[in-house]
Amino acid sequence: MQDDRIIRETGAAARVAAIVMPVLDALGYRLVRVRLSAQDGLTLQIMAERPDGTMTVDDCEEVSRAVSPALDVEDPIDSAYQLEISSPGIDRPLVRLSDFQAALGHLAKVETSVMVDGRKRFRGQIVGCTGETLTIERDKVAEGEAPLAEIPLDAISDAKLVLTDALIREALKKDKEERRQRKKARRRGEKGGVGDDGTAGEEQPDSAREGPARSASEGE
């Protein structure tokens, strides 16, 4: 089943998303979020990732080179802007059903477009997620409120993880395992006399840590 985004943009950001999504798909990436910010001049942030959730600095640069010409042709924004390509980071936005399911047990902030249980903002541990409903265990329960909040997914306008020690530990563990797998694959290639790049040669050092990555360029 296709893992489409549940949370989407409106206005100019939606126009940008419609332009860049086919470009990202062709390169093997997927769109996380588009956001326009007026702070320090107009900045267009395009957040993307590979299907496995990774996004390196080189990936950001590749995406920037690919989407810039498409944006120049379509010109969805009237004024000059700075283009910023970034990875989701550890405290990432949650925009797909798979994002919410992968975040089970972690603390998150959620905003809704309509009132749910008398409020539009929630903060708590994600304890369940079906195809229709997100269940959060509130970290602070007001008098008269139930500990668990049942939030319809189609009512969510924004959601992101909250940076915690547990989230950092999980991210470091995942990063360590990814490094181990890359090193293992590289050694297999060397035993066969061919490296990952298709050429024979000595083992190359590990690349820089694949954390939140950014690449910025000027747009018009």
From Swiss-Prot:
GO terms of biological process kind:
ribosomal small subunit assembly; translation
Disordered as annotated region, ranges: 173-220
Which key words tag this protein in UniProt? Cytoplasm, Ribosome biogenesis
| A cellular-component GO term for this protein | cytosol
| Pfam families, A to Z | DUF150_C, RimP_N
Where in the cell does this protein reside?
A: Cytoplasm
Q: Does the keyword Cytoplasm apply?
A: yes
Regarding protein family, the annotation reads: Belongs to the RimP family.
**PANTHER family, per the entry:** RIBOSOME MATURATION FACTOR RIMP
Q: What does this protein do?
A: Required for maturation of 30S ribosomal subunits.
Name of the protein = Ribosome maturation factor RimP
The organism encoding this protein is: Chelativorans sp. (strain BNC1)
**What is the taxonomic lineage of the source species?**
Bacteria, Pseudomonadati, Pseudomonadota, Alphaproteobacteria, Hyphomicrobiales
UniProt gene name: rimP
